[in-house]
Amino acid sequence: MNNILSNINIIEYNGKYNKKINDFVNLSMHIFIGRPFKQREDLINIQDYYIEKGGNFWIAFDEDKIVGTIALENRNTIGILKRFYVDKDYQRLGIGSLLYNEFETYVKAKTNIKTIYLACGKSLKDAHNFYTKNGWKQINKLDIDMHFANDD
C-alpha cells in the first residue's frame, strides 16, 4: 500500500484525547455531511456511552494528529457502527480499512452482536462503495437517510 500506513497507529479509547476527538468528529461531520459544530452527546463521555456498554471507540493517529475514528455502540445482539471518519487528506490510503478491521475483529471476538446497523447519507457514494465492498447490504429507510446492515 502506501508508506503512510507504517506511520498510522490505531488505539482503543483510553480516556485521553477527548477534545481532539470531539474536534475531529465535528470537523468531519461538517466537511462530509454539512452538520454544524456542537458538542455531540456520545462524545461528552465516550467511556459511558461506548466502553461501559460493551462497545468501543478507536482512534487512528499519524504521529499526534487524529486522522480517523470508528466506534461501536453495543445494544446486546445489535451493534451500531458510528463515528467512522477518515481525514479527507488521508482517504484512499487504507486507513479506513485498518479502522474497520479493528472494529470487525472486536465485534467477532468480544461481543454477542448478530447484526450491525449504520446510517449513511445518500450523497456519500464513496462510503456506500466501502460498505458494499465489505459485505454490507442496504436496507429500507429507517429514521435517517440510509441504513446498511451486516449480519455475517
Please give the residue ranges for each predicted region.
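C-terminal "cap" of GNAT-fold acetyltransferases
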Residues: 7, 24, 114-117, 121-125, ...
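Acetyl-CoA-dependent GNAT
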Residues: 5-8, 12-83, 87-88, 100-102, ...
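Conserved acyl-CoA
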Residues: 98-115, 130
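Short acidic N-proximal helix/loop "leader" segments that mark the beginning
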Residues: 1-2
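Glycine-rich phosphate-binding loop
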Residues: 90-94
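Conserved long hydrophobic alpha-helices within structured protein cores
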Residues: 34-37, 95-99, 127-138
